[in-house]
């Protein structure tokens, strides 16, 4: 049992660097395998070969029949299984010790650099490199080791190898023994003179232990699979969380500016247009700053604009040599705007605006009255 205690001490150190599933797996390994194998199973198989009897007196026949029936003892087979299953965990523990050794070296170097920094040396870049190496090895504050990077890969590989060894030993056991023992074995092998019957002691008790160890192996395999999925999804979650933290650290929260929005429009003459629709992208509560259309300045502005438009139109007709053409009523309509509510109602009711009469304000003279019948080049034909 001295060898079992040494293995137990090594596996006990893995507890501090394992996940919850790994700790449960180690508990199953200690209690239901190592402890049970060292107490009950060895005593059940203690008289295995001495109690194996065959119905022959031929020397050496019992030995060859026992070797054919049991190529390897169940106890030794389970010991090999425990050792092979524990080796990946011990390799992971060796990696943890390597990381801890690296931590000691980095801490010692960091202390030396801090002493040099107090003396005025510029060692900020070297300290930053040490922090990066600690993060790479998974070393956190207070000497705590976190599974990331190479340490996480080693842990996943150890779980995979443990699962492979569990399946391999279960298949080997099924191929060699099966999962039950019979009371009588027939043997026909030299130097036995003929086919002989051999008898096994306590086959029922041994069958119970075989089934129990089979169940423990299946439970350990299930724990390995669950732990593998747990580590896989936890790694994805940590990676997504790390990217999210990096994104929030590099880009601050975007808050909409109060100054943003639709541009403001203003009529500098203080008069509003006939229709001033709001912008389709204007925010709620947004209103155009418009002037009062009933204001006298607005009415004067509309009249002046109408007169100017009419004068421009007449000048254009004269330049084109169409001064003698008849102006239609539609062209002669002034550009007038309703200046009060009553005119607006008339427009809505369908009243048309009358054309402005062209009044010649020049005083009539005798010559003009005499020559009124003669056309002048600047007169308009009516």
From Swiss-Prot:
<dbReference type="GO" id="GO:0016324">
    <property type="term" value="C:apical plasma membrane"/>
</dbReference>
<feature type="modified residue" description="Phosphoserine">
    <location>
        <position position="257"/>
    </location>
</feature>
<keyword id="KW-1133">Transmembrane helix</keyword>
<feature type="modified residue" description="Phosphoserine; by CK1">
    <location>
        <position position="330"/>
    </location>
</feature>
<dbReference type="GO" id="GO:0007267">
    <property type="term" value="P:cell-cell signaling"/>
</dbReference>
<dbReference type="InterPro" id="IPR019570">
    <property type="entry name" value="Connexin_CCC"/>
</dbReference>
<feature type="modified residue" description="Phosphothreonine">
    <location>
        <position position="275"/>
    </location>
</feature>
<feature type="modified residue" description="Phosphoserine">
    <location>
        <position position="314"/>
    </location>
</feature>
<dbReference type="GO" id="GO:0014704">
    <property type="term" value="C:intercalated disc"/>
</dbReference>
<keyword id="KW-1015">Disulfide bond</keyword>
<keyword id="KW-1017">Isopeptide bond</keyword>
<dbReference type="GO" id="GO:0030054">
    <property type="term" value="C:cell junction"/>
</dbReference>
<feature type="transmembrane region" description="Helical">
    <location>
        <begin position="24"/>
        <end position="44"/>
    </location>
</feature>
<feature type="disulfide bond">
    <location>
        <begin position="187"/>
        <end position="198"/>
    </location>
</feature>
<keyword id="KW-0472">Membrane</keyword>
<dbReference type="GO" id="GO:0007507">
    <property type="term" value="P:heart development"/>
</dbReference>
<feature type="topological domain" description="Cytoplasmic">
    <location>
        <begin position="229"/>
        <end position="382"/>
    </location>
</feature>
<keyword id="KW-0007">Acetylation</keyword>
<keyword id="KW-0256">Endoplasmic reticulum</keyword>
<dbReference type="GO" id="GO:0005922">
    <property type="term" value="C:connexin complex"/>
</dbReference>
<feature type="region of interest" description="Disordered">
    <location>
        <begin position="317"/>
        <end position="382"/>
    </location>
</feature>
<keyword id="KW-1003">Cell membrane</keyword>
<feature type="transmembrane region" description="Helical">
    <location>
        <begin position="156"/>
        <end position="176"/>
    </location>
</feature>
<feature type="compositionally biased region" description="Low complexity">
    <location>
        <begin position="362"/>
        <end position="374"/>
    </location>
</feature>
<comment type="similarity">
    <text>Belongs to the connexin family. Alpha-type (group II) subfamily.</text>
</comment>
<feature type="disulfide bond">
    <location>
        <begin position="54"/>
        <end position="192"/>
    </location>
</feature>
<feature type="modified residue" description="Phosphoserine; by PKC/PRKCG and PKC/PRKCD">
    <location>
        <position position="368"/>
    </location>
</feature>
<protein>
    <recommendedName>
        <fullName>Gap junction alpha-1 protein</fullName>
    </recommendedName>
</protein>
<feature type="cross-link" description="Glycyl lysine isopeptide (Lys-Gly) (interchain with G-Cter in SUMO)">
    <location>
        <position position="144"/>
    </location>
</feature>
<feature type="modified residue" description="Phosphoserine">
    <location>
        <position position="373"/>
    </location>
</feature>
<feature type="cross-link" description="Glycyl lysine isopeptide (Lys-Gly) (interchain with G-Cter in SUMO)">
    <location>
        <position position="237"/>
    </location>
</feature>
<dbReference type="GO" id="GO:0005783">
    <property type="term" value="C:endoplasmic reticulum"/>
</dbReference>
<feature type="transmembrane region" description="Helical">
    <location>
        <begin position="77"/>
        <end position="97"/>
    </location>
</feature>
<feature type="transmembrane region" description="Helical">
    <location>
        <begin position="208"/>
        <end position="228"/>
    </location>
</feature>
<feature type="topological domain" description="Cytoplasmic">
    <location>
        <begin position="98"/>
        <end position="155"/>
    </location>
</feature>
<feature type="modified residue" description="Phosphoserine">
    <location>
        <position position="262"/>
    </location>
</feature>
<feature type="modified residue" description="S-nitrosocysteine">
    <location>
        <position position="271"/>
    </location>
</feature>
<feature type="modified residue" description="Phosphoserine">
    <location>
        <position position="369"/>
    </location>
</feature>
<dbReference type="InterPro" id="IPR013092">
    <property type="entry name" value="Connexin_N"/>
</dbReference>
<feature type="modified residue" description="Phosphoserine">
    <location>
        <position position="5"/>
    </location>
</feature>
<keyword id="KW-0702">S-nitrosylation</keyword>
<feature type="region of interest" description="Interaction with UBQLN4">
    <location>
        <begin position="264"/>
        <end position="382"/>
    </location>
</feature>
């Amino acid at each position: 049992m001295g060898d079992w205690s040494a293995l137990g001490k090594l596996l006990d150190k893995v507890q501090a660097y394992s996940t919850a599933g790994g700790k449960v797996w180690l508990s199953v390994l200690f209690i239901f395998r190592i402890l049970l194998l060292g107490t009950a199973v060895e005593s059940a198989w203690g008289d295995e070969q001495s109690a194996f009897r065959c119905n022959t007196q031929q020397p050496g026949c019992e030995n060859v029949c026992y070797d054919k029936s049991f190529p390897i003892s169940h106890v030794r087979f389970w010991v090999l299984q425990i050792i092979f299953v524990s080796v990946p965990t011990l390799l992971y523990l060796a990696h943890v010790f390597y990381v801890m050794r690296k931590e000691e070296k980095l801490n010692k170097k960091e202390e030396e650099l801090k002493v040099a920094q107090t003396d005025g040396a510029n060692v900020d870049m070297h300290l930053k490199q040490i922090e990066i190496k600690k993060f790479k090895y998974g070393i956190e504050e207070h000497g705590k080791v976190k599974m990331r990077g190479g340490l996480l890969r080693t842990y996943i590989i150890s779980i995979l190898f443990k699962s492979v060894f569990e399946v391999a030993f279960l298949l080997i056991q099924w191929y060699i023994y099966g999962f039950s023992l019979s009371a009588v074995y027939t043997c026909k092998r030299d130097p036995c003179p003929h086919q002989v019957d051999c008898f096994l002691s306590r086959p029922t008790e041994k069958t119970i232990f075989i089934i129990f160890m089979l169940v423990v192996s299946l439970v350990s395999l299930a724990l390995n699979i669950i732990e593998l999925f747990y580590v896989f999804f936890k790694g994805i979650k940590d990676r997504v969380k790390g990217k999210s933290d990096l994104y929030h650290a590099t880009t601050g929260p975007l808050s909409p500016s109060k100054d943003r929005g639709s541009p403001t429009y203003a009529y500098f003459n203080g008069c509003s247009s006939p229709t001033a629709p709001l912008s389709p992208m204007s925010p709620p509560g947004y209103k155009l700053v418009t002037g009062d259309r009933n204001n006298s300045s607005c009415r004067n502005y509309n009249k002046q604009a109408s007169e100017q438009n009419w004068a421009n139109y007449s000048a254009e007709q004269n330049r084109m040599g169409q001064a003698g053409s008849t102006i239609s009523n539609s062209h002669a309509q002034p550009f007038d705007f309703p200046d009060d509510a009553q005119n607006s109602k008339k427009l809505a009711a369908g009243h048309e605006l009358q054309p402005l009469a062209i009044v010649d304000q020049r005083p009539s003279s005798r010559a003009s009255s005499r020559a009124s019948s003669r056309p002048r080049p600047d007169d308009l034909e009516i």
